[in-house]
Amino acid sequence: MIDEFKTISDTIGEGYYTEKRSKFLAFAHHVTTVDEVKEIVAGYRKKYYDARHCCYAYMLGSERTEFRANDDGEPSSTAGKPILGQITKSELTDILIVVIRYFGGVKLGTSGLIVAYREAAIDALAHCEEVTQQIEEIVTYDFTYPMMNDVMRIVKDMNPRILDQTFDNTCSIKLSIRKSEAEQLRSRLKMLSFE
């Protein structure tokens, strides 16, 4: 069971590539939602309003199933796809790479564009800090007050993060634990009910 994934830190990775007087500025961001992607891309379009193209690609989610590549007026699959290819090759997720192109007056051709966008993305990724994050699952358990010591012994033993707890005649605890250990935690807590 996969219970971790690779992403980048919150520090923006910046890259640069130049080819036949065209300049490619690349920026890699840690993102978690499509709304965040839209906001960042809109910000770059506004900041670099005089640039010819603002191409990007992103991948979201621990399963890496939500992704998109945008060519922003470049010939089909010459900008967004090479950027996405670098994200895929690096096995990263929760990432957005934006590449701004300033046209230098000389056409690069499709292969030249593919190389330029790919190299700009590679440079941005080279200036990022890669981090591994755990996939966690929430476990909620309701119990009676006399069971408190047994529940807390399991919590101490398995070391989940305590998100919320209520202690009264009827108690409740909400825990966050690594996905691969969640079933074991549920099973151990459930066994307390039968003792």
Spans of model-derived segments:
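Interdomain boundary/hinge elements
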Residues: C54-Y56, E130-V139, Q165-N169
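Short cationic amphipathic helices and targeting signals
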Residues: F27-H30, E137-F143, T170-I177
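Short amphipathic alpha-helices in soluble, non-transmembrane regions
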Residues: V151-D157, Q184-S193
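Ordered, amphipathic secondary-structure segments that act as subunit-interaction surfaces
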Residues: F67, E74-L108
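Terminal, non-globular segments
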Residues: L175, E181-Q184
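C-terminal regulatory domains involved in ligand/effector binding and gene-expression control
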Residues: M1-T78, D164, A182
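A common structural junction motif
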Residues: Y48-A51, M158-L163, K190-E195
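Glycine- and Gly-Pro-enriched alpha-helical subdomains that act as flexible
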Residues: L96-V99, V106-D150, I154-V155
